[in-house]
Regions:
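Short Pro-Gly-centered beta-turn/loop motif in secreted/extracellular proteins
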Residues: 71-86
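Bacterial N-terminal signal peptides that target proteins for export
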Residues: 2-13
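A short, amphipathic beta-strand motif
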Residues: 31-39
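A short, solvent-exposed beta-strand micro-motif common in secreted/extracellular proteins
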Residues: 85-94
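Acidic, glycine-anchored loop motifs typical of Ca2+
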Residues: 94-103
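Bacterial N-terminal signal peptides
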Residues: 12-22
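Sec/Tat signal peptide C-region and signal peptidase I cleavage site
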Residues: 23-28
Length: 147
């Protein structure tokens, strides 16, 4: 009788674990990014997604990087199954096609770029809180590139 109770308890815990594993979906299967304001249709567009303020502030280690080279998909880029709820997006068009965001010697951007939620930049730096959004609350994000 004791082994039946022990086995039954293990089965119950395993079942509860599986239920919690499959019920809590922490990804977006419906988020679409529309990019506007790009310079020419022959240069790829890159989307970098950040989930941590530290990595965004240090310009390193994005959670994901999506590159879109197909001219027909420039306006609609699907972001599916990324594992975090709160993200901030940085988008740029790679005019010189070297795969990196190019800046001049002063650190000013040489390529069109934009952020999720399109914050007004003025003369201050963009912080993570200005671009972060909940992936479950949006179905479509439109990002305007600054030239």
């Amino acid at each position: 009788m004791h082994s039946f109770e022990a086995n039954f308890t293990k089965i119950i815990f395993f079942t509860i674990f599986l239920v919690f594993l499959f019920i809590n979906h922490s990804f977006s299967d419906h988020l679409t990014v529309k990019v506007t304001g790009f310079k020419d249709a022959s240069s790829p567009i890159y989307i970098w997604g950040y989930d941590r303020k530290f990595y965004f502030d240090n310009d390193s280690a994005p959670l994901f990087m999506v590159g879109e080279r197909d001219i027909n998909n420039f306006n609609q880029i699907n972001l599916k199954a990324f594992p975090h709820l709160i993200v901030g997006l940085f988008v740029f068009q790679d005019i010189d096609q070297n795969g990196i965001f190019s800046k001049n010697f002063k650190g000013d951007p040489l390529e069109p770029y934009g952020f999720s939620l399109n914050p007004v930049q003025g003369y201050q730096e963009i912080v993570f809180e200005d671009i972060a959004f909940d992936m479950n609350k949006f179905e479509k994000i439109e990002i305007n590139l600054n030239n």
